[in-house]
């Protein structure tokens, strides 16, 4: 739908208003259980409101700044997310190679690394756009990357942090994925819901 509207607007000569769709190349973390205060709780992390936006007709897309459903959104401060959910942020950074290439590239997305802590029970779900590129460029540009999940349960991150040891904060490159250094039970996925 956004592609159709943008093509129609461009055909009428309003090229500054043309905007490609965004690919939602990040994940939404949601879940529930007993929070760090011992209370029943549920959370949907609205970092998703800070996706990269598609390329414009005359400019590159906007990096991790908004979402089409919430044009004034932002990812929020990690300290606030840590106050309302049993997540400890270990990293939030620009997701490499998440922008769609073209004459004008799409906006880059972000990635976060969380540690669930101070809870006896917490169920985590990931919501993302896996398996397909559903937002190609308007006039032949390539789509952004798809989302994937990489959950590591029963890991050694807490022990590493307490010792002051370095730990990887992103997957790294495909040949030598840095997160493989973390010991634990792994779950990979490209499903929309995991």
For every predicted segment, state its role.
Residues 1-194:
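Glycine/proline-enriched, intrinsically flexible loops and inter-domain linkers
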């Amino acid at each position: 739908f956004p592609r159709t509207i943008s093509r129609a607007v461009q055909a009428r000569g309003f090229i500054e208003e043309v905007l490609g769709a965004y690919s939602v190349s990040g994940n939404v973390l949601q879940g529930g259980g007993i929070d760090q205060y011992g209370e029943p709780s549920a959370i949907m992390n609205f970092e998703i409101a800070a996706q990269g936006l598609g390329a414009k007709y005359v400019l590159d897309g906007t990096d991790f700044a908004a979402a089409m459903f919430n044009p004034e959104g932002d990812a929020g401060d990690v300290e606030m997310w840590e106050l309302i959910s049993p997540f400890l942020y270990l990293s939030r950074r620009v997701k490499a190679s998440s922008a769609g290439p073209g004459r004008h590239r799409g906006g880059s997305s972000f990635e976060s690394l969380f540690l669930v802590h101070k809870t006896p029970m917490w169920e985590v779900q990931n919501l993302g756009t896996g398996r397909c590129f559903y937002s190609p460029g308007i006039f032949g540009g390539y789509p952004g990357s798809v989302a994937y999940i990489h959950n590591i349960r029963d890991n050694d991150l807490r022990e590493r942090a307490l010792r002051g040891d370095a730990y990887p904060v992103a997957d790294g490159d495909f040949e030598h994925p840095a997160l493989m250094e973390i010991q634990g039970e792994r779950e990979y996925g490209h499903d929309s819901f995991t």
